[in-house]
């Protein structure tokens, strides 16, 4: 999977271009990635993955589950974290840091990252390709400036640098739609592989009979535009709408044009969302598309479920609204009793992707794409 110089877009002409010394590495992270930057980033990701796999020792590496009886972690009653390693589980390296490892893990929060980092340090920092359905704070891409002048700091970058120090050289994860996550990985010297669950979510929608010949795709803000375009192409539907999101006095408002309302009339509208958090964004879209647009049905394909606070009530779910999401994160509300939320498994797909990678599957090849799609996955469409 070598990138020839004529394959490189956006002025990239060197066959072995270096992300760290590129202009893209120095971009202002407070700004959204442009389409051109996303295209360049995708090439850097592919090149980094190729460079990582020039080391043939990964073909003989052990695939280890860090979520098993050999490794446990959690919290003491005082909420402090702990990590334990089974007595018989010895370090996998000889002290020279030249051992290679595939490790699958189910991360939920920063304590899980700390435990993973500590376990890898205990194993004497093997050169690790880590696979996880979720990586904490991976949506933290733009530092927000508040009304009082204070600025949000990005916690994600610190976590990524920490796991790189513990030996992580490659990271396979389910993408939350933010190109900032692989950007931070590349900055830290980690080759990222960002995967999308859209194929699996669509298959579930088809299985449940939610799709028909009057489908139109939608997104509620520019952040999901790339995934909406991927969805449009995947479904081969010719039309889509693009909402504009803004926040006013604590409320999220999504606006659509009269032309958008005309397009959705009597149609099934399919959204792609990174998460369902408080439900504010989707509630605004749902209200308008049903009341002003006269949409027939709304299907929400969400990478992660959160359902914080009264999100379920705010969304006003009924038979016209269906949410399909994954088990990549644990929701804050009990969604098992909802007739309008379907959860598909994705955590169990990560070890299978690691196995394919160990076998030398090129995920950018036609064969690699087909094998990912069999798992309900695809390379994320930046």
Set out the residue ranges of the language-model regions.
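PRPP-associated nucleotide enzymes
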Residues: 1-382
